[in-house]
Curated annotation (Swiss-Prot):
It comes from Phocaeicola vulgatus (strain ATCC 8482 / DSM 1447 / JCM 5826 / CCUG 4940 / NBRC 14291 / NCTC 11154). The gene is coaD. Belongs to the bacterial CoaD family. Disulfide bonds: none annotated. GO terms for molecular function: ATP binding; pantetheine-phosphate adenylyltransferase activity. GO terms for cellular component: cytoplasm. This is Phosphopantetheine adenylyltransferase.
Length: 151
């Protein structure tokens, strides 16, 4: 079985994230969405809420699992018996950062990272932008996967 983890904070999960998962499922048997817990990072939504929102989104697809973790990503990948890490790339800066991390993960754990370039129409969408819009009371529906609601 080809299993990948898709790690991130997902605060919140956007249509860009959704696109990465759907595209990864075209060549993976299973994708585990790993919500990293970082006590030093202030989040808009509690971890449990993010897990719940993403689980609801993929409730009809048994190939997608959702779990939170508070360890190194490579340790989470090992715990989930994943052979791959999937990451989305929006910019050159993202690529340079992810390339370095992918190299370290390969050297430390033998885990390959698959970089998926964002679809052009989604490159400007980020969780940071969505949180800023929420802060000012704006409707963020166009930036969320269909059916996802933010309370």
């Amino acid at each position: 079985m080809r299993r990948a983890i898709f790690p991130g904070t997902f605060d919140p999960f956007t249509i860009g994230h959704y696109s990465v998962v759907k595209r990864a499922l075209t060549f993976m048997d299973e994708v585990v969405i790993g919500i990293g817990i970082n006590e030093n990072k202030k989040t808009w939504f509690p971890t449990e809420k993010r897990v719940e929102m993403i689980e609801k989104l993929f409730a009809d697809d048994p190939r997608v699992k959702v779990d939170a973790y508070d360890c190194l990503t490579i340790d989470f990948a090992r715990a989930k018996e994943a052979q791959f890490i999937v990451r989305g790339i929006r910019t050159v800066h993202d690529f340079e950062y992810e390339e370095t991390i992918a190299d370290i993960n390969r050297k430390l754990a033998g885990i390959e990272t698959i970089l998926l370039f964002t679809e052009p129409e989604l490159t400007s969408i980020s969780s940071t932008i969505v949180r800023e819009l929420l802060q000012f009371g704006k409707d963020v529906t166009p930036f969320l996967p269909e059916g996802m609601k933010i309370d």
